[in-house]
């Protein structure tokens, strides 16, 4: 059997950005069963803007952007042919219509990668948390609150508070002395006319990540950005609700199924039934004070 870097692995999860981060603990398991192996980390071309966040990860030997936006091409298949262990990077849901009432997203991604629950349970608590290396310089903006207000490139409204909710809390934050930096998709609505509010959705994705990393904390929703800053171990508040429906099954149990892991346990999840608008703004403001 091949050993060390001669043993090559293709994986882990190519899209979407949040999913690729949720799947990072699979690398910890692979390192246990194939020590010192060479690991290709495939990223779908449509998510290539996120590639820099994976630089310096200790268990990623090479990042490979797929030949096509959403699937592999000849170059990808040629590499896979040389690999000794291949993980389906676009797998089906492990347990469609019910997983979100039983487990969180990290465990679901682990099972979707083809491994067993018993193997997931063997990981330590730290190994179950996605990790990213904060390798770039960060400019501290300790008086600025970052918000990533909308999910799914602004198209999945049920996963986030309404515009009205955001406008109200931004006004309260600014009146309390904070500056507010709005990150996300460039087509998202502007939420304030205040000089202490800035919209940065026109910046590149990676520039947004770098700028946000210097803020006091970020307020996110059920979206990939929450997983990025959780993997960096940065302070964050995540606004959650039971929005999800799959195969006619509603999300009624395991309320934190969509909560991001935070590598340094610096995430506070605020959950409300039916809508994020039901999360009390006073609770959000108090949570910021408590950080």
Regions found by a protein language model. Give the residues of each.
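Short, charged/polar "capping" segments at the starts of alpha-helices
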Residues: 46-52, 155, 186-192, 245-250
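Charged active-site motifs of nucleotide-sugar-dependent glycosyltransferases
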Residues: 7-8, 140-146, 178-179
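Nucleotide-sugar donor-binding patch of glycosyltransferase catalytic domains
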Residues: 230-291
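Active-site regions of enzymes building and remodeling cell-envelope glycoconjugates
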Residues: 57-65, 84, 95, 191-202, ...
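Active-site and donor-binding regions of nucleotide-sugar-utilizing enzymes
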Residues: 1-104, 207-210, 217-220, 225-228, ...
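Mid-sequence helix-capping/hinge segment at a functional interface
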Residues: 92-160
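Donor-binding and catalytic core of enzymes assembling or modifying cell-surface/extracellular glycoconjugates
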Residues: 163-242
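Conserved catalytic-core segment of nucleotide-activated headgroup transferases in glycan assembly
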Residues: 20-21, 26, 33, 152-182
């Amino acid at each position: 059997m091949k050993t060390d870097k001669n043993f090559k692995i293709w994986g882990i999860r190519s899209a979407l950005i949040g999913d690729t981060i949720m799947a990072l603990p699979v690398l910890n398991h692979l390192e246990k069963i194939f020590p010192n192996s060479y690991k290709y980390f495939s990223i779908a071309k449509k998510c290539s803007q996120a590639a820099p966040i994976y630089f310096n990860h200790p268990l990623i030997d090479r990042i490979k952007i797929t030949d096509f936006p959403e699937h592999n091409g000849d170059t990808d298949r040629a590499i896979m042919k040389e690999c000794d262990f291949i993980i389906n990077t676009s797998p089906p849901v492990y347990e469609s219509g019910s997983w979100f009432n039983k487990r969180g997203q990290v465990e679901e991604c682990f099972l979707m990668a083809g491994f067993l629950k018993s193997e997931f349970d063997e990981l330590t608590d730290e190994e179950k948390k996605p990790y990213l290396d904060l390798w770039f310089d960060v400019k501290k903006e300790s008086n600025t609150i970052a918000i990533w207000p909308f999910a799914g490139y602004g198209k999945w409204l049920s996963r986030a508070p309404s515009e009205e909710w955001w406008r109200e809390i931004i006004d309260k934050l600014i009146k309390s002395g904070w500056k507010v930096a709005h990150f996300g998709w460039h087509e998202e609505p502007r939420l304030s006319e205040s000089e202490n509010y800035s919209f940065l959705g026109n910046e590149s994705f990676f520039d947004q990540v770098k700028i946000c990393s210097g803020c006091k904390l970020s307020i996110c929703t059920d979206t990939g950005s929450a997983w990025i800053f959780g993997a960096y171990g940065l302070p964050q508040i995540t606004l959650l609700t039971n929005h999800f429906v799959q195969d006619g099954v509603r999300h009624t149990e395991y309320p934190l199924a969509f909560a991001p892991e935070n590598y340094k346990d610096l995430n506070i999840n605020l959950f409300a039934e039916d809508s994020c608008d039901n999360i009390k703004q006073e609770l959000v403001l108090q949570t910021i004070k408590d950080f």
